[in-house]
C-alpha cells in the first residue's frame, strides 16, 4: 500500500530493507553500500527518457534533457559527495532531497511530479525514525547554490560553445524573494499541486493569510508576489524563454458593452458589425516578445527547426490604482479593496482574435511598459447591420478570479504536436535533383517531324535526356501552388504612374465582398538578381519604430524577402507555366496559354512562409469540416487549440450614489486603473543542425554593412527600434 498515496510498492520494499539494515548499524558513520555508489557507466533505475532522474545512475551521461533531469544531476552529485565522506544519504532525508524538491516545486512535468512525490514519501516514512535533518539544515537562510560547469553559457554566450551546458534554474513562479532571500515558512518537502486541466488557475492569498499548500506566498501589500525574469535557458534539444513586462489596464468603455459597425456610406467590401467590450486581453503572439535579437541569432544559426511545447503564464504584483481630482491636483493611490477580474477562455467560446497581426502585444524591449489592448470582435453582418446568426457575448457570464492588490494569477498550457518550423534554406533546386554525369534510362518525345531531303513529314521520334537536356528529363515533383501577384519595383520610376494597389490587386470574393490575397500562399519574392522587385501583396511588411499609420514612405517600412523558397515555390510575380488549350490534328496546330494561378496537384512539394522575429507565432485553425494544409499564410504554427485568450478587466466600483432609490442603472464609477507584471515562459523543442557540409554556411550576422549605429538598441531619446526583419533561413539542407 502506498504511504499517503505517494509511496509505490517497489520504493516501500527498498526503504523497508534500508530500515532493517539501520537497526543493525554499529557506532560511527555507516559504510556506503557498494551498489549505492555512482558509476559513470551505470544506467541505474532511470526514468525512461531521462539521463539522471532515478537512483544509482552514473554522473557522466551528457547534458540533462530538461530542468527535472538537471535537478536530479545536482542531487546525485550531492549524494556522491556524502558517500565519499562516509555518509549514507540513502537511509535518511537531508538537505539534498529538500533542495531537489525546492528546485522542482513549479515543475509540472511527469518526471518533476514523480521526483517530488518520491522524496516527500521518503521524508514522511523517515520522520518517525528520526532520520530527517533538522530544519536548520533543511532550510538554511540562504539557498544552496547550484553548481555550474566553468564552460556553461548564459543567454548571451556564443553559439557552438564546446563542453557541457548544464541547465540553469527555471523561472520560479512561486518564489517571493531573490536567490539570497530567506525562504518561505513552508516545509520544503510539501509538493505543489499539479495543474489538473487546461486553464487551471491559482490566486495567491491576501496580506496576512497563511501559506498555501502549493507554496504560493502570502502576497500582501509590502511583499512582492513574484520576481522579474527575462532570459533564455538552453538545455540541449530545448530552450526555455522567459519574458516579464509591466502592463497597465485602463477602464474601457466606462464598463459598458457597445455595438460597433462600419460607417454609413462605407464601401460594401469594408462593411462590418460587432461589439466592443470593457475587457482587455493579453497578447504575446510574436516571437520578439520572447526572444532577444541575440537569442534569436543563436536559435537560427544552430538549429534546423523548432516548435513550441509548453507555456506558463503569470500575472503578479497586481496593483489597483484610484485616481482622484481635487482643486486641479491629480492624486493616484493604491486601492486595497478594489479588484480586477481574470479568466482564460479555455473552451474557445469567445471569438478568437489572437494571430491577426494586431498591435498591443508584449513589447520587444523589456523596459518598455505597455497598455493591455481592449477586446472587441466581429460577428456576421449584412452591410453594417446584424443578422439572425449574429452572436453577442457577455464576458461576465464566464467565471473569473477576483484579484486584489498583492494577488497573482497563473495558467499553464501544453501545445498540441505540430511539425518543426523549417529554419533552413535549400541548397538544391527541385528541377535539379539528378546526376549530371549520366543519361536517364527513360525516353522523351524529341520530334514530331523529320526531314527527308527537301520534304518534311510527320514522324514521332524519341530520345534519352542527359546532361545537355536537363529541362527535358523526367521529374518526380512539381513546384507548389501559385496565385500570381502584380510586380512592383523599389525604384519608383520603374512603376506605372497610376494608383493601382486595389484595382490591380489579386483578390478573392467571399460573402459578397472582395478581399486582398495578402500575403497569400507562400511564393518566392523575385527571381535571381532582381532584388529590387517584390510582389504587391505577397510579403509581410512591418513598420519601423515611429512610422505613421498612413502613407508611410518606403524607407520607413521593412519588407520581408522570401527569395530562399524559389527552389521549390513559384515566383509570386511570374506565371506558373504553360498549359495546352486545344486538340491538334492534321489540320490544326497545337496551342498553349499561360498559367497564372495553379492549385494543388498530386506530386507538389513546397515550403511554408518563413517566420520572423517580429512576426506571429501561431494562428487558430478555423473550426470547419475541411481544411487543406492549414499553415498560417502570415507564418507560424497552425493550431486547432491554441493558447486560450486571457481576459482581464477592472471591476466597476460605483461612485457616490444618490441617497434616494433610483431604478436607473449606474453610469458613474470611481476612476481606476490597474498595473502589475506579466511573465510568460515558453519551452521550445529544437532540431539541432548536424550538417556534413564542408564549406562554411551563410549565417545571420549584424555586420551586414558598415554602420555607425548599433542595431536593435535605443536612441538618444530612449526609444527602442528594430531596423530590419530577421527570418530563420540561413543554414542550408539538401532537398
Short names for language-model regions:
Residues 139-735:
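Capsid-like jelly-roll
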Residues 2-154, 170, 177-178:
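Extended terminal accessory/targeting regions
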Amino acid at each position: 500500500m502506498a504511504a499517503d498515496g505517494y509511496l509505490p510498492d517497489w520504493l516501500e520494499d527498498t526503504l523497508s530493507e534500508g530500515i532493517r539494515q539501520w537497526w543493525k548499524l554499529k557506532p560511527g558513520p555507516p559504510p556506503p553500500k557498494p551498489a549505492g555508489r555512482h558509476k559513470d557507466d551505470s544506467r541505474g533505475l532511470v526514468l525512461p527518457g531521462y539521463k539522471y532522474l532515478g537512483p544509482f545512475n552514473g554522473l557522466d551521461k551528457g547534458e540533462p534533457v530538461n530542468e527535472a533531469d538537471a535537478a536530479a544531476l545536482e542531487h546525485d552529485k550531492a549524494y556522491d559527495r556524502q558517500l565519499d565522506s562516509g555518509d549514507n544519504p540513502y537511509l535518511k532525508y537531508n538537505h539534498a532531497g529538500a533542495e531537489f524538491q525546492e528546485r522542482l516545486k513549479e515543475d509540472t512535468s511527469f518526471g518533476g511530479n514523480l521526483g517530488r512525490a518520491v522524496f516527500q514519501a521518503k521524508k514522511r516514512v523517515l520522520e518517525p525514525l528520526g532520520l530527517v535533518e533538522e530544519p536548520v539544515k533543511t532550510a538554511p537562510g540562504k539557498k544552496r547554490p547550484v553548481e555550474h560547469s566553468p564552460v556553461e553559457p548564459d543567454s548571451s554566450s556564443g553559439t557552438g560553445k564546446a563542453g557541457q551546458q548544464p541547465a540553469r534554474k527555471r523561472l520560479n513562479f512561486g518564489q517571493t524573494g531573490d536567490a539570497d532571500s530567506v525562504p518561505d515558512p513552508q516545509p520544503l518537502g510539501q509538493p505543489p499541486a499539479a495543474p489538473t486541466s487546461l486553464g487551471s488557475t491559482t490566486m495567491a492569498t491576501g496580506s496576512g493569510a497563511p501559506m498555501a499548500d502549493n507554496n504560493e506566498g502570502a502576497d500582501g501589500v509590502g511583499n512582492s508576489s513574484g520576481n522579474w525574469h527575462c532570459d533564455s535557458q538552453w538545455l540541449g534539444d530545448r530552450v526555455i524563454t522567459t519574458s516579464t513586462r509591466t502592463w497597465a489596464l485602463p477602464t474601457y468603455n466606462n464598463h459598458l458593452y457597445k455595438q460597433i459597425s462600419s460607417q454609413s456610406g462605407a464601401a460594401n467590401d469594408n462593411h462590418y458589425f460587432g461589439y466592443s467590450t470593457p475587457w482587455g486581453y493579453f497578447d504575446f503572439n510574436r516571437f520578439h516578445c520572447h526572444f532577444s535579437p541575440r537569442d534569436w541569432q543563436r536559435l537560427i544559426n544552430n538549429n534546423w527547426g523548432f516548435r513550441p511545447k509548453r507555456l506558463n503564464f503569470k500575472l503578479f504584483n497586481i496593483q489597483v490604482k484610484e485616481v482622484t481630482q481635487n482643486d486641479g491636483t491629480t492624486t493616484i493611490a493604491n486601492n486595497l479593496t478594489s479588484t480586477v477580474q481574470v479568466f482564460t477562455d479555455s473552451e474557445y467560446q469567445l471569438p478568437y482574435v489572437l494571430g491577426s497581426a494586431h498591435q498591443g502585444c508584449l513589447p520587444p524591449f523589456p523596459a518598455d511598459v505597455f497598455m493591455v489592448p481592449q477586446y472587441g470582435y466581429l460577428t456576421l453582418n449584412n452591410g453594417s447591420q446584424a443578422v439572425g446568426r449574429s452572436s453577442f457575448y457577455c464576458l461576465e457570464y464566464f467565471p473569473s478570479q477576483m484579484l486584489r492588490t498583492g494577488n497573482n494569477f497563473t495558467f499553464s498550457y501544453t501545445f498540441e504536436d505540430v511539425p518543426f518550423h523549417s529554419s533552413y534554406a535549400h541548397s538544391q533546386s527541385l528541377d535539379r535533383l539528378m546526376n549530371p554525369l549520366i543519361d536517364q534510362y527513360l525516353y522523351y518525345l524529341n520530334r514530331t517531324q523529320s526531314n527527308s531531303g527537301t520534304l518534311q513529314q510527320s514522324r514521332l521520334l524519341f530520345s534519352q535526356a542527359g546532361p545537355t537536356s536537363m529541362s527535358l528529363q523526367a521529374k518526380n515533383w512539381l513546384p507548389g501552388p501559385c496565385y500570381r501577384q502584380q510586380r512592383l519595383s523599389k525604384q519608383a520610376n520603374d512603376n506605372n504612374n497610376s494608383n493601382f494597389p486595389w484595382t490591380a490587386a489579386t483578390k478573392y470574393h467571399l460573402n459578397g465582398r472582395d478581399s486582398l490575397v495578402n500575403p497569400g500562399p507562400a511564393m518566392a519574392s523575385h527571381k535571381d538578381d532582381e532584388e529590387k522587385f517584390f510582389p504587391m501583396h505577397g510579403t509581410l511588411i512591418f513598420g519601423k519604430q515611429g512610422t505613421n499609420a498612413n502613407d508611410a514612405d518606403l524607407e520607413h517600412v521593412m519588407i520581408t524577402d522570401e527569395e530562399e523558397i524559389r527552389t521549390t515555390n513559384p515566383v509570386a510575380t511570374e506565371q506558373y507555366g504553360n498549359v495546352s488549350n486545344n486538340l491538334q490534328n492534321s489540320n490544326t496546330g497545337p496551342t498553349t496559354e499561360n498559367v497564372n494561378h495553379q492549385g494543388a496537384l498530386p506530386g507538389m512539394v513546397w515550403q511554408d512562409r518563413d517566420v520572423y522575429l517580429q512576426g506571429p507565432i501561431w494562428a487558430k485553425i478555423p473550426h470547419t469540416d475541411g481544411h487543406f494544409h492549414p499553415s498560417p499564410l502570415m507564418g507560424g504554427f497552425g493550431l486547432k487549440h491554441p493558447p486560450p485568450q486571457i481576459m482581464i478587466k477592472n471591476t466597476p466600483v460605483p461612485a457616490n450614489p444618490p441617497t434616494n432609490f433610483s431604478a436607473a442603472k449606474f453610469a458613474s464609477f470611481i476612476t481606476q486603473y490597474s498595473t502589475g507584471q506579466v511573465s510568460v515562459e515558453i519551452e521550445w523543442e529544437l532540431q539541432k543542425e548536424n550538417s556534413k557540409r564542408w564549406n562554411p554556411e551563410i549565417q545571420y550576422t549584424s555586420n551586414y554593412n558598415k554602420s555607425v549605429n548599433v542595431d536593435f538598441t535605443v536612441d538618444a531619446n530612449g526609444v527602442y527600434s528594430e531596423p530590419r526583419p530577421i527570418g530563420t533561413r540561413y543554414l542550408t539542407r539538401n532537398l
